[in-house]
């Protein structure tokens, strides 16, 4: 294992992930710790799979595990487990009672031709990332769709991810882009909680104003700017983009734990 990269897991961090990714601790030609380190290097630097340094396992082996964990939901489970651990470490219940919803549009690379559109407001051709976070800014659910889909429609995909997972959830805060009875009814039916749309004091004003608690999810999106692989969407398929977000948020939460 190469120990020279700042993105490499510490021993304590690996002890946490090992219980999630490798509970049997089976011997392998390429240790899973090295494979995870390669993924963390890739998402931080934004390099191509083939450009992963040679002192990591072969790039096709790393990609094999990325695809396997993506398809089997392992990366999502990892993100969820880390969120619960961070919450407990900060003296909170393992599941939140309040969620905060928002989205951001991200430009896709020129070679991406699927699951993308043009966000007319932001003038961005790419994909939209939907997120619901807790009051600590930790991700509860993520979804990705074409940037031209309105928030009130695209949010349904992230709501579906949350079904039967947050028994304490009572309210989700959102901005004016999520107005409408249709979405509110879906949230009530599927999650059993209230969707509270918080508007700025004057929606027609272009002056900046901080909306209580809404800044939390915006801060969560800003954390992702430290990871080049997700600052611009290079993935052919939105499922891979989602998996990259899950890895990035997992890396963020690992640092909060240790």
Whereabouts are the PLM-identified features?
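Short alpha-helical elements
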Residues: 1-258
């Amino acid at each position: 294992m190469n120990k020279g990269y700042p993105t490499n897991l510490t021993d304590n961090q690996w002890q946490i992930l090992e219980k999630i990714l490798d509970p049997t601790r089976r011997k392998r030609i390429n240790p899973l710790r090295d494979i995870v380190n390669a993924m963390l290097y890739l998402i931080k630097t934004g390099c191509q799979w083939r450009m992963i340094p040679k002192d990591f396992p072969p790039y096709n082996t790393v990609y094999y595990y990325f695809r396997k964990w993506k398809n089997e939901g392992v990366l999502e489970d990892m993100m969820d487990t880390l969120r619960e651990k961070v919450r407990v470490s900060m003296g909170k219940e393992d599941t939140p009672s309040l969620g905060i919803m928002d989205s951001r549009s991200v430009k896709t690379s020129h070679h991406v031709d699927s699951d993308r559109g043009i966000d007319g407001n932001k003038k961005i051709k790419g994909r939209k990332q939907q997120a619901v976070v807790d009051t600590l800014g930790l991700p509860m659910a993520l979804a990705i769709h074409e940037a031209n889909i309105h928030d009130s429609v695209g949010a349904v995909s992230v709501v579906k991810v949350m079904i039967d997972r947050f028994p304490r959830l009572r309210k989700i805060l959102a901005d004016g882009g999520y107005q409408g009875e249709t979405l509110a009814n879906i949230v009530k039916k599927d999650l059993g909680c209230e969707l509270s749309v918080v508007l700025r004091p004057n929606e027609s004003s272009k002056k900046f104003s901080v909306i209580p608690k809404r800044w939390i999810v915006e801060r969560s999106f800003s954390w992702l700017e430290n990871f080049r692989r997700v600052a611009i969407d290079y993935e052919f398929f939105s499922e891979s983009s989602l998996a990259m977000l899950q890895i990035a948020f997992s890396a963020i939460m690992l640092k909060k734990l240790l």
